[in-house]
Amino acid sequence: MKANQTTETIHIAPPNIKNGKVWIKGTAPLVVHKFSDKAKNMIRAKQEAGSTANTKKKREAKDFTEVFNGARHISFDGWDGIPAPAFRNACIRACSLVGFKMTMAKMSIFIEADGFDATEGTPLVKIYGKEPRQLESMVRLATGVCDISVRPQWLEWGACLRFRYDGDQFTAEDVINLVHRAGLQVGVCEGRPGSTNSNGCGWGTFEISDEASVRALEKEGGAK
């Protein structure tokens, strides 16, 4: 070691990961839109067919009920859910409202899954509410062609968010307040106000609630 050279010791504290949960209730309708398995299979079949896929084929009739059910995230246990990353992303986006670095938030807050999508394995948060209605909306595709988009919509809904967070970055109260901001100012799923592609449709917003109020939605005929 050279004369007068000093050494510096770096101390890394162990992870201070904590857990919590909060019940939420929708303040606006929720619209979910899963990329259907049928659409994925059609794309795969076309790619497997190669050049022969360019031959003209008869256009298959559109089964609106099938499209509606294909747009739902249904777990292995049969209940409808919202992708858990949707809530995490909303919380991370809400950090920009309070001056907290989103890059730090990405490593500091996580939403636990209640289950997984039965066909694609997406982590899901269970929806409490009545069975969704079939929403049919006129949309314009990227090609400029008009189409009818068929999606499930819950007019009343709720959920229980189980979260993990870095206790050196947030307190439990911080996370709950962040979830509240995410619900009122960012939203989740289709037509949310915090969408990066549009100004939203006034859907997907929520507020902090309590277990009794959210479970009451289930008793009215929602997820089992």
Which residues make up each language-model segment?
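RNA-interacting cores
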Residues: M1-K224
